[in-house]
Amino acid sequence: MSDKDDLRKYSSQVIDGVEAAPARAMLRAVGFTDADFDKPQIGIASTWAMVTPCNMHIDKLALEAEKGANAAGAKGVIFNTITISDGIANGTEGMKYSLVSREVIADSIEVVTGCEGFDGLVTIGGCDKNMPGCLIGMARLNRPSIFVYGGTIQPGAGHTDIISVFEAVGQHARGDISEIQVKQIEEVAIPGPGSCGGMYTANTMASAIEALGMSLPGSSSQDAIGGDKASDSFRAGQQVMELLKLDLKPRDIMTRKAFENAIRVVIALAGSTNAVLHLLAMANAVDVELTLDDFVELGKISPVVADLRPSGKYMMSELVAIGGIQPLMKRMLDAGMLHGDVLTVTGQTLAENLAGVPDYPVGQDVIRPFDQPIKKDSHLVILRGNLSPNGAVAKITGKEGLRFEGTARVYHGEEGALAGILNGEVQPGEVIVIRYEGPKGGPGMREMLSPTSAVMGKGLGKEVALITDGRFSGGSHGFVVGHITPEAFEGGPIALVENGDRIIIDAQTRQITVDVSDAVLAERKTRWVRPESKYKRGVLAKYAKTVSSASEGAVTDKYL
């Protein structure tokens, strides 16, 4: 067997020998030559679609990755998986499909690669669920693989982005701006291709994946348009051939230490609460034990230093302009915050990758020094108490305060809550409770971006809190707590809260409680009846039957 045959572990089973003549005939029709049958096959999973600006350019990046694979002596084969648009679906029934799409992306990458016999993979993602979906798919297959991020969008006119539009809706409801002004913001906020422009979920997860070692250095911090992203895609296609030669696979890279690095980088960047959910799910895919407690312990020793939206003032494109996250990671490594001995897709360790990285330019204030942090410990606060015995996730930078106490205003679902905020039913001093939005109860664990944006737009950001068994967009800010477990559909305490109950959220003690006795909660539980799901067939019904708790990453293969 030749060295090249050693690199064809999977494709050789599909196309070698006289018995495989039908398979070769099919491949000749899509462009294979005699010479191509002797090459390793690199699958290139593209999430291209015209349903969202996050992904509208990824077809071109897939072609670059194919060129890179071919230039390195492999044969690149492009295939597509799906994407949805959180920005379009938020606030609607369609958002129930968002988290489901993470599983569909992972499943489809596994299905196509397993069927076709690709020897290695490049996956390219743009919108939020693409990133964890691609990583979970690659992790399950455990073949030499690299992730490429589609890149960030440019700011809209007046330093606007998609969150500017969501919050304009609330400003209009308050009477601060006219419908014409809302339309003016709407028309300029999204100027072209790329993922949403703050440290929202897409940029958070791309940064986490780079810190994890599963993308090439710099991939998370490049504009969607321009030469850097095309080059990143080409080099990824080339590098998979090197990973094949090294036999370096996702499980060699996605180790416990690598996940700790990813968590600490997410914290430094003030990243999205969705990172908790997705990192738990990605760890599950490689059998790395990761729990909410790990976020607690690492959070105690990890400062927030990035002044990025939604909590800060800068956009991702401004971080790109000063060097991206590589200088931050170099600072963190030098300060002993990262494990430098972990392997990455370069074939080198993280420390080796960062050895020659220059620091940020003098005078920039996007990334602060560690001795002048925005917050000395994590903004991702894991809360427990009689309202969430299995844990909840809050994003608290300190600007919102560290404690909130108020009376419950309860809604069964997002739509009622949004209406209550916009029509003035929600009053200062209240805790908005949105329940039956968990992974099973929604189903799909919708993001509460429309309600949180309405809260901010109505000027209630410091006057109310919002808690839910659903999730939040990376663009949400304010005093918000999500991922409450057990969820309402499972009979968790959030299902037992009544209007007027006193709720206390304390980030310093990491507690979330309802001021109701155990006896009263027990009595309410006897009267509680699980609502019947309206989904009896199809993907949402299947998802609700198989999905795990949010505290376990909301995965669908944990208890099979």
Question: Residues of each region from the PLM?
Answer:
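Glycine-rich, highly charged phosphate/nucleotide-binding loops
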Residues: 98-107
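A short, small-residue-rich loop immediately preceding and capping a beta-strand
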Residues: 113-134, 146-149
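Catalytic or ion-coupling anion/metal-binding cores of large enzyme and transporter domains
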Residues: 2-56, 61-80, 87-88, 93-98, ...
